[in-house]
Regions:
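Catalytic core of nucleotide-sugar-dependent glycosyltransferases
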Residues: 1-244
């Protein structure tokens, strides 16, 4: 794609991911720092982290199905339920009856978490996500395989790419592409954690992690940044940069 755009005379220099340096938390939601201490007590690569980002909203029924799917999977889980994920519902109202008491030994529910810290934690074995691009990049950087459940805009395209790259397992919601069902959530988790397909996805994601880090340290991202700086210098001196 980059080469095709350049052939059309478009100046493009891909850089990133850009969240690594000088990252400042921008969310107004209070973060559950205690979740990191909880993760410290879990086995390596055992926890399913489930979060739908800062903007996506889902129905009360789907939150119930998601929660029950996590429960039925028998995996430890960290579930994020934003205050506005389901309108007019508190965390306790948004979850199935007695869910918190039934899962307190192997699950944690938070309103918001420090996602980069969570994804870099050794205990995380998979990330159940809406496939927003920020979450996707953060997961790739940390080598955490994805369970994809896109909701809107570019997220379906993102998941299609991730599945084609063999770094994600989709939650198969059928033609409707919206309604979560607990058995489908459980099936996707089991596929990632216990099947040969899941093993391939985990292995491939670790390869993507290395590619991303090489791009930042000495690869395309670094060379693109250096080229951009050089082009700006040339223009400041009244010279014609390479892309013109």
């Amino acid at each position: 794609i980059v080469h095709a755009l350049r052939d059309e005379g478009i100046a493009i220099d891909p850089m990133g991911p850009l969240f690594l340096k000088g990252h400042k938390r921008a969310s107004l939601l209070s973060e559950d720092g205690g979740c990191l201490e909880w993760l410290d007590k879990q086995m390596s690569s055992s926890v399913i982290y489930a979060s739908f980002g800062s903007n996506v909203k889902i129905s009360l029924e789907e939150v119930h199905e998601l929660a029950l799917g996590l429960e039925d999977s028998q995996q430890p889980f960290l579930l994020v339920i934003r205050p506005d994920l389901v309108l007019d519902n508190t965390i306790s109202d948004a979850l199935p009856t007695d869910f918190l008491s039934r899962t307190k030994e192997r699950g944690r529910v938070s309103t918001w978490v420090p996602q980069l810290d969570v994804l870099s934690h050794d205990a995380i074995g998979g990330f159940l996500t809406h496939c927003g691009w920020n979450s996707t990049l953060e997961s790739i950087w940390n080598g955490k395989p994805l369970i994809g459940c896109p909701r809107e805009s570019e997220q379906n395209t993102n998941l299609k790419c991730l599945v084609d790259w063999n770094v994600a397992i989709p939650v198969d919601v059928g033609k409707n592409k919206v309604n979560l069902k607990k058995d489908l959530v459980t099936k996707a988790i089991h596929k990632l954690m216990y099947t040969s397909e899941g093993q391939r996805v985990r292995k491939k994601m670790l390869e993507f992690k290395e590619v991303a880090r090489c791009a930042m340290e000495s690869g395309h991202s670094r060379s693109s940044l250096n080229k951009l700086v050089q082009d700006i210098k040339e223009m400041s001196l009244g010279r014609k940069p390479d892309f013109l």
